[in-house]
């Protein structure tokens, strides 16, 4: 197993798109994308923290309210490949800026929605921003990496925005909803996007693609057997996570009997653990992405398996939600680094389809999770999630046994 200093060149070294900028400017550029990821993920998963409030205010079930998570995922699945092909050779900097503007408009639409249908229209609009952003930002992480920062670390820097969103976004969203209502919470999120937009306008360097992505480029990752193995594992583990985590707040309320403040604190713990997990993944995945993903799957599976039995008391809930948060904080970075390892030359071309698949996972997970919660309850949902994670673990352990970070150096 190589040490950090012996990491594969494809992961250890950056591929700077902005080599003429100062080191400070390079760091500010990648941080502006990380902050954009924070704002976007806060917007995407804000309903997780306010699900009970929205459902109660609009007189709908928690499962029905879960469409606020499902519809953006569906729209993002279409937007990722369509935008990537449709924009041709456009400077990706302008795309990122435009998508941040769409995010602001989408959140404002939800805040002022007159009924649930208008609210969902705003969430569909958000899906466009989500799909386009992820198809662009993750694929360009290596080109935005400051001097001396590897691709795995650059990816984890951007993904840090995601995990910080779970620390500050979802829990603070739940807290703000209790303080001033869920509508004002979405309006505040829209306003937070304004400085993010300005930061990207002034800080992002030119991000011209090597060549325009064509429709025939989208399946680029699918031609690699080990990339397909990674996609299957991500599908199984991701479905389990999003099906279960979307309805954690209702579980805490109805099964554990926790009040809103306690639920917000537990979600904050989840996010804080996720930050640690994300940082851990930036280093561990650089050594062995396969072993890191196996550890992540095992921790998520243990969490979902024990949740119905031990998360009904505060200590058990805190321990399990912390373990779950740490594991999932590492998961997105592992998924991206896996693709850099097994298909380093095809990541940018194939990332839009990978992002589309990930968004389908979010949509299907929250959708079927909602149906299961409404019909069978959260305990059955968690049991099914555990089974899916176990299948993902076996996929990585057996079908992915040939995956080694040395593959990136050989490409």
Identify the meaning behind each predicted range.
Residues 57-59, 91, 112-118, 257, ...:
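Helix-breaking motifs and short loop linkers at transmembrane-helix boundaries and internal kinks
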Residues 78-117:
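Conserved MFS/SLC helix-loop-helix module at the cytosolic interface between two early adjacent transmembrane helices
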Residues 79-92, 277-289, 373-374:
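Helix-to-loop junctions at the C-terminal end of transmembrane segments
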Residues 106-109, 117-126, 315-323:
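Paired small-residue
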Residues 114-118, 147-204, 259:
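Helix-loop-helix hairpin linking two adjacent transmembrane segments in secondary transporters
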Residues 122-161:
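Cytoplasmic helix-loop-helix junction between adjacent transmembrane helices
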Residues 291-335:
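C-terminal transmembrane helical hairpin of 12-TM major facilitator-type secondary transporters
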Residues 342-378, 384-385:
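A late C-terminal transmembrane helix in Major Facilitator Superfamily
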